[in-house]
From Swiss-Prot:
Protein name per its UniProtKB record: Zinc finger protein pat-9
Chain positions covered by the region annotation Disordered: 1-25, 191-235
Annotated tissue distribution: Expressed in body wall muscle and gonad (at protein level).
Listed InterPro entries: Znf_C2H2_sf (IPR036236), Znf_C2H2_type (IPR013087)
Encoding gene per record: pat-9
A Gene Ontology molecular function term of the record: chromatin insulator sequence binding
Zinc finger feature spans (C2H2-type): 84-106, 112-134, 140-162
Amino acid sequence: MENRTPMQHHSGYEIVKSEPPSTPKTLIKSSYMENTPEMVFGSFPIHSGFCTQVVTHTDPMNNNNQPKTNANGRALAADRKRPYPCNLCSSKFGSKMELEEHQNSHTGQKPFECDTCNARFNRRSTLWNHKRIHSDAKPFVCTVCQMTFKWKNSLKCHKDMHQRKNETSAHLDNDLRQLTYATAAKRKLQMEQEENGGLPASSSASSVISHPLITTTSGNKKRSKAAKAKQTPSSLATTLSQVHLGAVQPLHASALVPPSDHQIDLDTTSLDSLMQSQNQNFLMQLYGYSDDGRHNGGMLSLDDTMLSNLSDSKSDSGSSSGGLSIQLPMQTINMLNFRNLGTQQLPPVHQLASSLPSVSSGMDYVNVNQHDSHYIVSQPDMMLGNQPLYHNGSFANIEKSNPHNNQFTIDSCVLLPSSRQDYPFDYTMVNQQYPMQEQVHDQTVGVSVVQQHYAEQAHAHGKTVPHEQW
């Protein structure tokens, strides 16, 4: 009978577990970790000779890094167009700038930043596409319905709709395949210039200023230069427009004429003194002062009593509106000559009424001499007792005991200038049947007494009295 013993020491698990690892990954990793890293890829170091060692381990038939030549030994056209290969991969590029952008994908650097949202990108083209989000520019234009789009895919979907309706051709589809964002923007700018008659379109210029298409530089220095280049033409244009508007703008009348509410402050003292002197000279000539040689000197030679009685009647506006109570000295005034009844008339004195102060002193026609052709004007306190009173062309003797006297104000048109010329005046020619308004006062003088004296001394006509019988 055979005894079977288990093989405890010959298990395959224990043998495999005891073997040391001999995979090529560990060998490669251990060999690269011993050296100093020169490039950072993600979160682990990469040796500078990584690409060369990888190429050595690859198939020897793969010669991507070696330039391809033709039978004459010259490099092919594709290789001549892309002379800048990548050290980390088999990619080739036509410019050094494109190679640097490609290496950013290996290193993880993002040097291109958006000015609006501060987003960073590793490729410049990616930044260009991102900036379309912030701008309202729509450079892609449909050639059928002239609709504009921001993205090329949107225009392509729109063209498919026209193609289903048989509104487009294959030539337009081929043109759409070769269309890029830059070429679409240039084409739209040319179309706007043609519509405006060859002049640069203002809308396109405003769109370029407000919505820049592309930022091709990553440095701040070049960016500041581009900003200055954009701001310089606009600032010059605004300055020239302001100068042009300032030259064409007309002159306003308000700059020459002061406003209506502007109060002009004038010194009226000289005008007041002039008017006062004229008024005083007129009063002097009116009451006979001009005949006397002592009073021909003007305002300075007036009598002190007359100057003391004059008061200032000037109101706030500078015009004499209030009346003056002036006590005039006793002087003789030429009365009207009723002998010669001619057609001559008195010169009007109403023209001087505005410049003269109104005289409101009460006068009495008393003490009339029958042999003299003058009326004596006296003050109320110098009234005589039993004197005849002139009333409606006749004389009336009023008793001294009668306290009422017919007092009235002299009208300015009755006063004569100082030349003492006799003017014929007929009261009946002016007022035939109406008595003088300011001379007749039935309330103060008895009607019966007036009628009695009127019957005794009236003339045959009953209206006037001859000059010789006064």
